[in-house]
Amino acid sequence: MSRIGKKPVSLPQGVTATVNGQTVTAKGPKGELKFVVNDEVLVKMEGSEIAVQPRDQTKTARSKWGMSRTQIVNILHGVKDGFEKKLEITGVGYRAAMQGKNLQLALGFSHDVVYETPAGVTIAVPKPTEITVTGIDKQQVGQVAAEIREYRGPEPYKGKGVRYAGEKIVRKEGKKK
């Protein structure tokens, strides 16, 4: 039984939502997002709240119940406040810079890595060692941050590479003589 799925989702101030069949559409100050709920989950609007229920008591329907509610909460939060992921670059000569709409990364390769910014996401470089990814879609912001981190993930010996802000890297001890 989903404990999170039982709670109805209340609409934040300044956000309007509509439920049309299995599609939930949210409009807010930052933009508009749509989410198609799985067929095994029933979604309905009750006043200024969105209620999510499983269609039957099968294991798959109950497992998708809480996840559907959480994704609805995420689109409501996204159109109101948006989401942000911060990345840090550590290492000698490792740096980032914006080149038009593209992110240019110097990560110790023989060439610079150029990352094209997808639509719906904004990338900013406040310092050469910091990258900020912002957008209204939580999944897309996280995906872009993960793709940037994947170019040169933090290594365990010196901790060089691209990491999430606040991420702890488990360090290893080097070889001993």
Curated annotation (Swiss-Prot):
One of its GO terms (cellular component) is cytosolic large ribosomal subunit. GO terms for molecular function: rRNA binding; structural constituent of ribosome. Keywords: Ribonucleoprotein, Ribosomal protein, RNA-binding, rRNA-binding. InterPro entries: Ribosomal_uL6-like, Ribosomal_uL6-like_a/b-dom_sf, Ribosomal_uL6_a/b-dom, Ribosomal_uL6_bac-type, Ribosomal_uL6_CS. Pfam families: Ribosomal_L6. One of its GO terms (biological process) is cytoplasmic translation. Part of the 50S ribosomal subunit. Belongs to the universal ribosomal protein uL6 family. This protein binds to the 23S rRNA, and is important in its secondary structure. It is located near the subunit interface in the base of the L7/L12 stalk, and near the tRNA binding site of the peptidyltransferase center. This is Large ribosomal subunit protein uL6. It comes from Mesorhizobium japonicum (strain LMG 29417 / CECT 9101 / MAFF 303099). The lineage of its organism: Bacteria, Pseudomonadati, Pseudomonadota, Alphaproteobacteria, Hyphomicrobiales.
